[in-house]
């Protein structure tokens, strides 16, 4: 895989792209698992230079590590992603995760530990279980994250519907 053709080797890279083609807990529509490869394909068509930031993506040192393969269960995805991100951070590189459904956000926060997050979502995803007896799903991810980091470090934008 190549992220938009902006590729260097792993050793010199500053940014490591990881795809997480996962949508096992989606309940309305599936298909988020196709996003990582679709985003990569679309990245081939971007203009590389930004007048606003004076940054040319072509100058960034990006390595695409491909897609996470530990996807058989929610738990294996979370643990595999968390371990992968931890390794990338130990090497003083910046992980860039493209997914998939937002349950994967838990794996990212689990690896980062001391972070804040901004969530763009129409729902708060604060259910304790969804569906019944399922602790890790797209509808519970913000609640699970709030068990890892302070609620003061979570900002939700775009919320239009919640559950009591």
What are these regions (language model features)?
Residues 1-164:
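Conserved alpha-helical scaffold segments that buttress catalytic/binding sites
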């Amino acid at each position: 895989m190549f992220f938009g053709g902006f590729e260097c080797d792993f050793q010199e890279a500053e940014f490591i792209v990881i795809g997480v083609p996962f949508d096992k807990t989606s309940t309305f529509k599936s298909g988020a698992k196709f996003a990582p490869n679709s985003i990569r394909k679309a990245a081939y068509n971007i203009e590389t230079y930004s007048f606003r930031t004076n940054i040319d993506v072509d100058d960034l040192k990006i390595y695409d590590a491909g897609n996470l393969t530990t996807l058989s269960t929610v738990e294996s995805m979370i643990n595999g992603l968390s371990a992968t991100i931890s390794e990338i951070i130990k090497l003083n590189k910046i992980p860039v995760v493209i997914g998939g459904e937002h349950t994967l956000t838990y794996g990212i926060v689990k690896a980062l530990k001391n972070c804040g997050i901004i969530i763009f979502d129409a729902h708060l995803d604060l259910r304790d279980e969804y569906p019944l007896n399922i602790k890790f799903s797209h509808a519970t991810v913000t609640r699970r994250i709030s068990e890892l980091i302070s609620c003061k470090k979570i900002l939700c934008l775009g919320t239009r519907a919640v559950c009591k």
